[in-house]
């Protein structure tokens, strides 16, 4: 039994090493620099060993995408818990979303397809941020029809993700200006939620 446990631990450790190596390569070279051979070289294995754990590069991207959505969800939950009202929660959550995008730019890129194709396999974890935001929007608006909440979510997402994407690609606006644009957008949309409620 101990031998089976050890083998399972070693397999999980190798799997984690593959994902960590992939992420390190992406941090150094970008997503276009990632391939199975580089991962194998990084962890000192042969490429066929990598394929025992992940069928292809997309499978690795999918796992990293899941990781990103789990991390983002946790940051959004924390932001929501720190707020005194649904309106404040919404503001803190979108600010946390913004902060996450720049603190882990590479994962954000694969999660949302910025300067690359996002992961083709949908992961259930991608729904968690959406649910957190729509639940909070619904609270602010007094529980309107789901279609209205969905529309308001995508209004927020379109503006904030668009601003993030522009900054990742690089437009050279000063940080202070970006922050003011972000805060103006968030407060404007929150105001529209309260008016519509």
Residue ranges of predicted features:
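N-terminal intrinsically disordered/low-complexity leader segments
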Residues: 1-13, 195-197
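Generic hydrophobic, amphipathic alpha-helix propensity
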Residues: 11-22, 39, 64-68, 72, ...
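Amphipathic alpha-helical segments enriched in hydrophobic/aromatic and basic residues
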Residues: 26, 35-36, 57, 61-68, ...
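Amphipathic alpha-helical packing segments from all-alpha helical-bundle domains
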Residues: 100, 118-143, 150-154, 180-191
